[in-house]
Amino acid sequence: MPKIVDHDRYRKELLTKSFDLFAEKGYATVTMRQIAQALGVSTGTLYHYFPSKEVVFEQLLEELTRLDILSISEQLKEEETLLGRIRGSFKLLETHREYFLKQALLIADFRQQQRRDGQESQVFQRIYDQVENLIPELFGIDDPTLTKFLMIYVDGLIWQDVYGCNCVDHQSQEDLICEMVTMYLEKHGLQQE
């Protein structure tokens, strides 16, 4: 009897397993052959699922985003208030700090390579739009300005780790953002859900 393969699940497994290789070597230097070797598959198998390294990487970013969304949704499902959801997000960010640092460095490497090659991938816009549309649902806010601010603030915290200064006290930043959001909501007559 022939082996039944769930191709979508297998493709996603290949993607998530490739993250560590990209994080270790960087986007620019990794080849399809190295990816195949690291995954323990033939280059033919890899090309069956992904026509190029760029496609592997773009689909990896989209899969990581999907998994991150599931993770944060799970983390926040019991939180009943906006401030509780913000604090839960900070807990997740702190717990997976190294992962988000690797992700930021990879994204920067990919963007640099794209710019060098005169290309412009749409993957970042798709991911940004997906996250921007999800935040109101996850956090219970319906304010585009606040949504963008929270996204920028979190990105800034991650980039502090990229700088390597180890000077960010996440607890004090969590307290500050909660205070700022509370004041913003009060000033604009918005409800904390």
Give the ranges of each region predicted by the language model.
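Amphipathic, non-transmembrane alpha-helical scaffold segments
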Residues: 11, 15, 61, 65, ...
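Amphipathic alpha-helical segments used for helix-helix packing
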Residues: 94-118
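Short, charged helix-capping/linker segments at alpha-helix termini
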Residues: 5, 28-29, 140-144
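Amphipathic C-terminal alpha-helical segment
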Residues: 95-99, 113, 150-171, 183-191
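Amphipathic alpha-helical packing segments from all-alpha helical-bundle domains
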Residues: 114-148, 175-182
